UniProtKB/Swiss-Prot annotation:
Belongs to the pancreatic ribonuclease family. Residues 1-25 form the signal peptide. CDD domains: RNase_A_canonical (cd06265). This is Ribonuclease pancreatic gamma-type.
Length: 152
């Protein structure tokens, strides 16, 4: 009888997981490189001129679903330019790992910072454009960007 109960509970668990898995968002099926592209790449044109750029981008890229991400940076350069940073100067990441690389030249970026009074679901961001070196973590073979670490 104990075996039958265990078998029933296991079958029920498999059934529930089968229902839950398809309902998970795109984010759960992304590779780290795809997540980096979704969260940080915006190759379109020059610096954004709209003061609501960050509000629009953070929402459209899925970074305000269930909570407001406090800070994010978008890079306005071709993906190939950012991928090439993985073969440039290696530096230590903020978390102490040694898989970060610093761009040899400055890149066009936009920082999105959550305003202090902003609360989910009304995520409100300040938009700041600048030109800085970026530091990204790279993994894989070939190396590809998987994490935006900093801008300097």
């Amino acid at each position: 009888m104990g075996l039958e109960k265990s078998l029933f509970l296991f079958s029920l668990l498999v059934l529930v997981l089968g229902w839950v898995q398809p309902s998970l968002g795109v984010e759960s099926r992304e590779t780290p490189a795809q997540k980096f592209e979704r969260q940080h790449m915006d190759e379109e044109g020059p610096f954004p001129s709209s003061p609501t750029y960050c509000n629009e981008m953070m929402k459209s890229r899925g970074m305000t679903s269930g909570w407001c991400k406090s800070m994010n940076t978008f890079v306005h350069e071709p993906l190939a330019t950012v991928q090439a940073i993985c073969s440039q100067g290696q530096v230590t990441c903020k978390n102490g790992r040694n898989n970060c690389h610093k761009s040899s030249s400055t890149l066009r970026i936009t920082d999105c910072r959550l305003k202090g009074s902003s609360k989910y679901p009304n995520c409100d961001y300040t938009t700041t454009n600048s030109q800085k070196h970026i530091i990204i973590a790279c993994e894989g073979n070939p190396l590809v960007p998987v994490h935006f670490d900093d801008s300097v």
